[in-house]
């Protein structure tokens, strides 16, 4: 699954995202170039959540055109992406196993988990070196 993380107003680097098709008018094919619509996958979403503290929700990228993968940064970019409905970050972390992986990668990910269990809380604190 491909995922676009977004803030409350869905405005990112001057581009206003919406449900449905979104197209970058300044797209460039260069993998190291910022010109394009960036997104990640479900295996790397936690890395990006912690780099983007204003994230409030996500949308699934249901299709894309002219995708380029940037393996070193764990992200993709495309000229055009079609986004699904707005979903709360907590939906992505809806199972104990997903929560455990998230806080093991970065204890700060706990802020996206609704009602974390004591074990998840302990893992998060331990990960951040507070225990």
Where are these regions (language model features)?
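Short, glycine-biased loop/turn motifs at secondary-structure junctions and
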Residues: 1-130
């Amino acid at each position: 699954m491909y995922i676009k993380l977004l803030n409350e107003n869905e405005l990112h680097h001057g581009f206003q995202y919406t449900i449905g098709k979104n197209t970058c008018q300044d797209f460039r094919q260069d993998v190291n170039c910022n010109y394009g619509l960036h997104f990640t996958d479900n295996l790397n979403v936690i890395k990006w959540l912690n780099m983007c503290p204003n994230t409030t929700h996500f949308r699934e990228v249901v299709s894309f055109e002219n995708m380029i993968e940037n393996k070193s940064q764990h992200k993709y970019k495309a000229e055009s992406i079609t986004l699904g409905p707005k979903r709360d970050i907590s939906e992505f972390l809806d199972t104990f196993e997903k929560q455990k992986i998230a806080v093991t990668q970065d204890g700060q990910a706990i802020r996206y988990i609704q009602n974390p269990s004591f074990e998840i809380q302990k893992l998060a604190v331990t990960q951040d070196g507070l225990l």
